[in-house]
A protein has these predicted regions:
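Feature captures hydrophobic
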Residues: 1-141, 147
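Conserved SAM-binding strand-loop segment of SAM-dependent methyltransferases
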Residues: 200-211
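A short acidic, Gly/Pro-enriched loop at the edge of an enzyme's catalytic core
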Residues: 212-221
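A short glycine-rich, Lys/Arg-flanked "PGG" loop and its adjoining helix->strand segment in the class I
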Residues: 236-248
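Conserved beta-strand signature within the Rossmann-like core of class I S-adenosyl-L-methionine
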Residues: 249-257
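Substrate-binding/catalytic lobe of Class I Rossmann-like enzymes that use SAM or dcSAM, i.e.
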Residues: 257-366, 374-376
């Protein structure tokens, strides 16, 4: 037991984190079994032990930043059999197959509209905001929605397909401010019903559908925060579907979290508790999947903006928890704050990125550009 504690203490000290130290990002350990649990389970052991109250940290976001910036993950050599099985499973199974496509909808996005309504902005946008010229979450999300509309060159009367429509925030904004018709698909029943109610009276429609079943012809396609659920085995098929549904002169905007290097597995804790079967793509994986199908017109990275987005979500969640605790117990609260704050640390450390790609079928004559600032009717 003493050896376990010494090993973990040495690892944390290598990234300037002290056990039972006095700084906000130092951790306070309450259970002596914490050390063996972390060494055997890595990220899964760290996250589950936090959920169980074995340790605390005043600034989880900065704790995560310290670990990732210092590359502590490269120093932990001990891997549990469960972790190794998780990696092997990712290699040999298609965890994002059509048969499994609705799992994340039921287990994450159907968690409860009450939780997301209190945590997110007024438009219920569950993706990175664009914080340029914004000082609050609502404005950052409006900025992001308008940025997407301008990048797609939206004009009144255009038909837009949204792959992964969430609670209908983009569809509502685009229909109200740009006069377009939006058809959205989702794998979450609660999201679909919320979007249908929210967008009543607008030229929008929503359905419960897997992206592989899509057909039709659209002037523009947008996918915001959905590609992370596709999986590397399906990236090429996803791009083929987008090409099939896009008009020859149309634009496709892909908004996704990205990682700096390719991976065929995801974080075990995140996979178990937050996004089952999720996977973050790399630049090479995206480029390869689009090769021969699309011309990449623009590639915009504003990953630094996910840090304040996640911090704002956590602030809203903490402020609202008294209204949620009858349904969500203390262990859920610790799980959720761990998810939000540790994710903030991944973006702060630049381990994760946020990309918006604009793609066309054959390249735009004269090149691609978009208006820097213009918001009609809003």
């Amino acid at each position: 037991m003493a050896d376990f504690k010494k090993t973990v203490s040495t690892l944390f000290e290598s990234v300037d984190i002290q056990i039972n130290g006095s700084r906000p990002f130092d951790i306070q350990v309450h259970n002596k079994l914490f050390y063996s649990r972390v060494l055997s389970g890595k990220s899964l052991g760290l996250g589950e032990s936090y959920m169980d109250g074995w340790w605390d940290c005043e600034a989880l976001d900065q704790f995560c930043y310290q670990m990732l910036w210092g590359r502590i993950d490269k120093q932990i050599k001990v891997k549990s059999p469960a972790f190794l099985m998780h990696v092997l499973r990712a290699y040999f199974l298609n965890a994002q197959s059509k048969k499994r496509a609705y799992i994340v909808g039921k287990e994450h996005y159907d968690t409860g509209n009450d939780l997301f309504a209190l945590m997110l902005d007024q438009r219920m946008i569950y993706s990175c905001g664009y914080w340029k010229d914004a000082d609050n979450l609502d404005q950052a999300q409006i900025n992001k929605l308008d940025l997407v509309c301008r990048k797609l060159h939206l004009k009144p009367g255009m038909r837009v397909l949204e792959i992964g429509s969430g609670w209908g925030g983009f569809a509502k904004y685009a229909a109200e401010n740009y006069g377009v018709s939006v058809h959205g698909i989702t794998v979450s029943k609660e999201q679909m019903e919320y979007a249908q109610e929210s967008c009543k009276g607008l030229d929008t429609s929503f359905e419960l559908k897997d992206y592989r079943d899509l057909n039709g012809n659209y002037d523009a396609i947008v996918s915001i925060g959905m590609f992370e659920h596709v999986g590397y085995k399906n990236y090429r098929d996803y791009m083929k579907v987008a090409r099939r549904c896009l008009d020859d002169n149309g634009l496709f905007l892909l908004h996704t979290i990205g990682r700096n290097t390719p991976s065929r597995s995801t974080d075990p804790w995140t996979n178990k508790y937050i996004f089952p079967n999720g996977m973050i793509p790399s630049p090479a994986q995206i480029s390869k999947s689009a090769q021969g199908l699309f011309v990449i017109e623009d590639w915009h990275n504003f990953g630094q903006d996910y840090d304040p987005t996640l911090m704002a979500w956590n602030e809203n969640f903490q402020k609202s928890y008294d209204n949620l605790k009858d349904r969500y117990d203390e262990r859920f609260k610790r799980m959720w704050e761990y998810y939000l704050l540790m994710c903030a640390g991944t973006f702060r450390s630049r381990r994760n990125q946020l990309w918006q790609l604009v793609l066309s079928k054959k390249g735009l004559k004269g090149g691609y550009s978009y208006q820097n600032s213009h918001r009609p009717n809003s």
